[in-house]
Amino acid sequence: MEKIFTLIVILREELVSIAVLAFLLSYCFRTQRTSRDNSFIRICMFALLHAFLDALALITVNNSAFVPALVNGILQKLLYISAIMCINEIFTYVHAIAFFKKKTKNVRIASYVLVGLAALFIILFKGSYNNVNGIIYGGGIPLMVSYGVGIFYQISTILLLIIKYREVGESFCRIMIPVRSEEHTSELQS
């Protein structure tokens, strides 16, 4: 019983994220959708995938006696790639709003090339594991690549929101700038 409670405490952020994202997705699928809604659904699905993989990776890496190292390694790499894919979708969404879909195709292609290169680095390099207060987390070069690309996209998104403030819309910027800044700060702290 104690192990289950400890697991719930460890996974509390992931469980809340999964519940909220699942609720938002179910709401979106039940209502009429616009192209903006479809973009939100893509972002939400990548975020849900990332939260699910985060929970699964935490469970498997902390039970390495029962889970093969290969499975842990694959889950960690998928976790990092899903994070990059999610922030890439947010960036391309904000870019499309800021430039009224002008030049978005080239930016989207370039962003997918960056995601592909980052995924290649993540796949090629071996990760490591860190024990922090009795909880094992992934680390190493794949994590650094994921954080580096994520921080690049965070800063790019914040700059787009600031530079294209009027085009994007004041209310959208009032929501997104603090959210992007908070996520960027939490990435730097980890």
Q: Where are the model-predicted features located?
A:
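Hydrophobic alpha-helical transmembrane segments of multi-pass membrane proteins
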Residues: I10-T92, I109-G127, I177-S186
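Membrane-interfacial segments
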Residues: Q32, A65, H95-K102, Y165-F172, ...
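Extracellular-loop-to-transmembrane junctions of the mid-late helices
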Residues: E2-S17, A118-L160
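Interfacial "cap-and-anchor" motif at the non-cytosolic start of specific transmembrane alpha-helices
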Residues: L159-S186, S190
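Alpha-helical transmembrane segments in multipass membrane proteins, preferentially the mid-helix core
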Residues: L21-Y27, E89-Y93, G127, Y147-E170
